[in-house]
A protein has these predicted regions:
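General beta-strand structural signal in soluble alpha/beta enzymes
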Residues: 70-71, 86-87, 111-113, 136-140, ...
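Rossmann-fold NAD(P)-binding glycine/threonine-rich loop
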Residues: 91-106, 113-154
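Charged, alpha-helix-enriched surfaces in structured cytosolic catalytic cores
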Residues: 22, 143, 147, 159, ...
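Short acidic, glycine/serine/threonine-rich loops at helix termini
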Residues: 28-29, 61-64, 122-125, 147-154, ...
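Glycine-rich beta-alpha junction loops
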Residues: 52-57, 142-144, 167-173
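Conserved anion/nucleotide-ligand pocket segment
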Residues: 154-180
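N-terminal glycine-/serine-/threonine-rich beta1-alpha1-beta2 phosphate-ribose binding loop
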Residues: 2-106
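Glycine-enriched alpha-helix->loop->beta-strand junction motifs that scaffold or abut catalytic
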Residues: 106-109, 170
C-alpha cells in the first residue's frame, strides 16, 4: 500500500465500492448494517468511504449521505484514504479494468466477483498485485462463492495438487439440483 496510508490494525479498514447493483449494494448494506458488530475489540472495523454507481438516486436500503459519491468509478483508485476497492461493475474492459489496474498498481487491495475481468485479464492483474504487494481477492467469482481458493491456497498447502475436477459454478449447481 502507499506510504501515506495508516497501517494501524486498530483503525477501520477504509473501503470504496464501485457498482451498487444487487451484489455491490448488498455488500454495502451488510457493511453498513453490521458496522457495530465489526467494532468488537478483536475485530478491525470497516468504513465505507466512497461509492460509485450508475445512479445516485436509487434507493439501496442504506444511507449514502455520509459517503463520498463518484460519478467516475475509476477515480476511486486515486484516493489516498482507501485500503480496499470492491469492484462490482462487471465487464472485462473499460472502467472496471481501469479501476482494478490502477488500484493494484497503487498498492490498493481489490475484491472482485467479476468473472469476465479475471478470465480476460487475470494473469496481468495477478502480476500487478504481486509487484505492488496488494491482494487481489476473487473468491466470490468462482465456485459459487464457496471458499475454494482459500482452501486450496491455505488449507492444502502441504499437499501436491496435480488436478482438480468438478462443477464449481453456482449457476450449474442450481440447474443440476433442479434437474434431480
Amino acid at each position: 500500500m502507499s506510504s501515506d496510508k495508516t497501517e494501524s490494525h486498530t483503525a477501520p479498514l477504509r473501503v470504496a465500492i464501485a457498482g451498487l447493483g444487487v451484489v455491490g449494494g448488498e455488500v454495502a448494506r451488510q457493511l453498513t448494517h453490521r458496522a457495530d458488530a465489526m467494532k468488537a475489540p478483536t475485530v478491525r472495523g470497516v468504513e465505507i468511504v466512497a461509492v460509485s454507481a450508475r445512479s445516485r438516486d436509487t434507493d439501496r436500503g442504506f444511507d449514502i449521505s455520509n459517503i463520498d459519491w463518484y460519478e467516475d468509478a475509476a477515480a476511486l483508485a486515486t484516493r489516498d484514504d482507501v485500503d480496499v476497492i470492491v469492484e462490482m461493475i462487471g465487464g472485462h474492459d473499460g472502467v472496471a479494468l481501469e479501476l482494478v489496474k490502477t488500484s493494484l498498481s497503487r498498492g490498493i487491495h481489490v475484491v472482485t466477483a467479476n468473472k469476465a475481468l479475471l478470465a480476460h485479464n487475470g494473469t496481468e492483474l495477478a502480476r500487478l498485485a504481486e509487484e505492488s504487494g496488494a491482494a487481489l481477492m476473487f473468491e466470490a467469482a468462482i465456485a459459487g462463492g464457496i471458499p475454494a481458493v482459500k482452501t486450496l491456497r491455505e488449507g492444502l498447502v502441504g499437499n501436491e495438487m496435480t488436478r482438480l475436477a468438478g462443477i464449481l459454478n453456482g449457476t450449474c449447481n442450481y440447474i443440476l439440483t433442479t434437474m434431480e
